[in-house]
């Protein structure tokens, strides 16, 4: 990868960012089986959940770059692993400080392209049955329309904005990209690096940004954006495909990249 990677040390999110943006947004789902998704991460600012993430290595969590929009360095960003409930004591739950955040060099606040980032934890996660990385999808292929995939998160579960305390899960059906690009849907905005899932009253919602779309046993994509009104069938959920970015991710994880460091 020849582009520089921008690394921001100990940066944080403002909770309002993921709440107010029409991006990444589980509505119409159900409570997930406790600890059945040991890769799930909760990105937290000052102790409040703001975005989801996926543990992809013992010290790295993959999420969405737009979760960084409007950040300030005066707040505290942490990553919670091993959790089902955000508030109840659980034996496998641990809150990790963040050493650094690496934004994809192509990501921008005014664009939905290249919407990925990586959190480097302050130290390696304690791995086991309840905390375990999920493999990346490495095959750069189109997921067949109608394929059922899994999303999970702690995002809002009602249009009124109610947030759950326990992890929610939803099975979604993959939509053909050409259909998703019709004028009646996303009107040409879906690039080859994105994919869509049907969202008729069942959708990711605010606070689910950055979480994984899991097809089979791998991270297929990352929750990115959709409609301001979650569950709008005319605005399918949009995800950033992971396979295209595997070389960048692996370069970041291995340290084989040129980085710019700012405070």
From Swiss-Prot:
Disulfide bonds join 51-67, 149-215, 180-196, 205-230. The active site is at residues 66, 115, 209. Glycans are attached at residue 46. CFD is activated by the removal of 5 residues at the N-terminus, named activation peptide, by the MASP-3 isoform of MASP1. InterPro entries: Peptidase_S1_PA, Peptidase_S1_PA_chymotrypsin, Peptidase_S1A, Trypsin_dom, TRYPSIN_HIS, TRYPSIN_SER. It is found in: Secreted. Residues 224-228 are annotated as: Self-inhibitor loop. CDD domains: Tryp_SPc. GO terms for molecular function: endopeptidase activity; serine-type endopeptidase activity. Serine protease that initiates the alternative pathway of the complement system, a cascade of proteins that leads to phagocytosis and breakdown of pathogens and signaling that strengthens the adaptive immune system. In contrast to other complement pathways (classical, lectin and GZMK) that are directly activated by pathogens or antigen-antibody complexes, the alternative complement pathway is initiated by the spontaneous hydrolysis of complement C3. Belongs to the peptidase S1 family. PANTHER family: COMPLEMENT FACTOR D, KALLIKREIN-RELATED. This is Complement factor D. The gene is Cfd.
């Amino acid at each position: 990868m020849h582009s520089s990677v921008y690394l921001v040390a100990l940066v944080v999110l403002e909770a309002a960012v993921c709440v107010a943006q029409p991006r990444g947004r589980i509505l119409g789902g159900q409570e997930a089986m406790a600890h059945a998704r040991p890769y799930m991460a909760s990105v937290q600012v000052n102790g409040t959940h703001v975005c989801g993430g996926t543990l992809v290595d013992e010290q790295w969590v993959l999420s969405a770059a737009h979760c960084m929009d409007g950040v300030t360095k005066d707040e505290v960003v942490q990553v919670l692993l091993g959790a089902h409930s955000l508030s109840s004591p659980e034996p496998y739950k641990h809150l990790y400080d963040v050493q650094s955040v690496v934004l994809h060099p192509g990501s921008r606040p005014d664009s939905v392209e290249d919407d990925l980032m990586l959190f480097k934890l302050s130290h390696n996660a304690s791995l086991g049955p309840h905390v375990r990385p999920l493999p990346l999808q490495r095959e750069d292929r189109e997921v067949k329309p109608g394929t059922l995939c899994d999303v999970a998160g702690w995002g809002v579960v009602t249009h009124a904005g109610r947030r759950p305390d326990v992890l929610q899960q939803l099975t979604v059906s993959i939509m053909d990209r050409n259909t998703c690009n019709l004028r009646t849907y996303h009107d040409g905005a879906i690039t080859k690096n994105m994919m869509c899932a049907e969202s008729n009253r069942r959708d990711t919602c605010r606070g689910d940004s950055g979480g994984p779309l899991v097809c089979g046993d791998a991270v297929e994509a990352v929750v990115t954006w959709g409609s301001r009104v979650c569950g709008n069938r005319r605005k399918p959920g949009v995800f950033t495909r992971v396979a295209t970015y595997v070389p960048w991710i692996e370069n970041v994880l291995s340290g084989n990249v040129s980085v710019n460091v700012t405070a």
